[in-house]
Amino acid sequence: MLSNSQGQSPPVPFPAPAPPPQPPTPALPHPPAQPPPPPPQQFPQFHVKSGLQIKKNAIIDDYKVTSQVLGLGINGKVLQIFNKRTQEKFALKMLQDCPKARREVELHWRASQCPHIVRIVDVYENLYAGRKCLLIVMECLDGGELFSRIQDRGDQAFTEREASEIMKSIGEAIQYLHSINIAHRDVKPENLLYTSKRPNAILKLTDFGFAKETTSHNSLTTPCYTPYYVAPEVLGPEKYDKSCDMWSLGVIMYILLCGYPPFYSNHGLAISPGMKTRIRMGQYEFPNPEWSEVSEEVKMLIRNLLKTEPTQRMTITEFMNHPWIMQSTKVPQTPLHTSRVLKEDKERWEDVKEEMTSALATMRVDYEQIKIKKIEDASNPLLLKRRKKARALEAAALAH
């Protein structure tokens, strides 16, 4: 039974992220003869949602909660609920209240202004089975998963232009996240859902269970990374987290263009040692007939997303500025094999999804292990030389 939290304290706000500072506009004594060229744009200026108010009253005051399961997130079931006043349908996700759950809700709330990210409507703090829980009310996405929609389209050909438009939609979600210093880190087929079954439905990114804030914390002293030395301004942990999303874009784009994944397990395991090796070594191909009509430019775009070295992967800005994405209306309407292959391999699709889930989990673990060493532990030869000299001077001073 759901009930309101103990006490009737006012709603608890999440702090709203500060807007990025705007550079002052210099005053011009005379208008220039020609307007100056615009500065190169790294990210569009996005509006970030203001602070989230967590409601303390019982959710059943406002919504009718049903037992209809809409889906399974990494942290539990998503249920169908109805607004009692408007009868509008929504999705309810329940998280046991803890700092990690609050971070997930906060990051998702910040991002839910984006048209290609599932929108949070309300958040409640209620007791459920004697435990304090966060109840997240989200818009209901009725259109099903991205690849199920392509599987179910019958004889209608799926084209390269459609693949480009889909990748642009997913890219817009990632661009929004990266621009406000959030890495999703779990971009995969089952987290990409359509708003409805209609042809004009919008594709949206869901499930922020692994999302992470990526604000860089540069130190005055140069840290050392394992397994190699590099300055923090060149490589911060945030580069790894964001590169995880770019790798996902590469895998999804590959599947969209042919119907099967670039990496696969030979032995029916969720992720076999061989598959891990192929991912780490970047071993994949563009075999015919599925790839025969796909341009070399598009294959190169995939190669730049699936680079084995995370820091060499394309950034989201580079991806969104690529002609295949930016000018998606000009992409040829070449019929692809995707729909046929997805239908033929339908029984294998759950394995494909499981493999990608495992690959992303492995990647997150690998990147978490790249920790900054303390300055005392650093093996920087210059620091070692300076320390040796300091110790020699200290010893000389003590001797006198």
From Swiss-Prot:
Stretches the record annotates as p38 MAPK-binding site? 366-390
Q: Which gene encodes it?
A: MAPKAPK2
Q: Which species expresses this protein natively? A: Homo sapiens
Q: Tell me, what is an example of a GO biological process annotation in this record? A: toll-like receptor signaling pathway
List Phosphoserine occurrences by residue: S9, S272, S328
Q: Which residues form the Protein kinase domain?
A: 64-325
**InterPro entries with a match to the protein in the record:** Kinase-like_dom_sf, MAPKAPK_C, Prot_kinase_dom, Protein_kinase_ATP_BS, Ser/Thr_kinase_AS
Motif segment (Bipartite nuclear localization signal 1): 371-374
The listed outcome for T222E is:
Mimicks phosphorylation state and constitutive protein kinase activity
Tissue expression from the record:
Expressed in all tissues examined.
Q: Taxonomy-wise, where does this protein's organism fall, top ranks first?
A: Eukaryota, Metazoa, Chordata, Craniata, Vertebrata
Tell me the protein family, please. Answer: Belongs to the protein kinase superfamily. CAMK Ser/Thr protein kinase family.
Q: What is the protein name given in its UniProt record?
A: MAP kinase-activated protein kinase 2
**Record-listed ATP binding positions:** L70, G71, L72, G73, I74, N75, G76, K77, V78, K93
Q: What does this protein do?
A: Stress-activated serine/threonine-protein kinase involved in cytokine production, endocytosis, reorganization of the cytoskeleton, cell migration, cell cycle control, chromatin remodeling, DNA damage response and transcriptional regulation. Following stress, it is phosphorylated and activated by MAP kinase p38-alpha/MAPK14, leading to phosphorylation of substrates. Phosphorylates serine in the peptide sequence, Hyd-X-R-X(2)-S, where Hyd is a large hydrophobic residue.
The effect annotated for T334E is:
Mimicks phosphorylation state and constitutive protein kinase activity
Q: Which CDD domains match?
A: STKc_MAPKAPK2
The EC class name is transferase
| The keyword Ion transport is assigned to this record | no
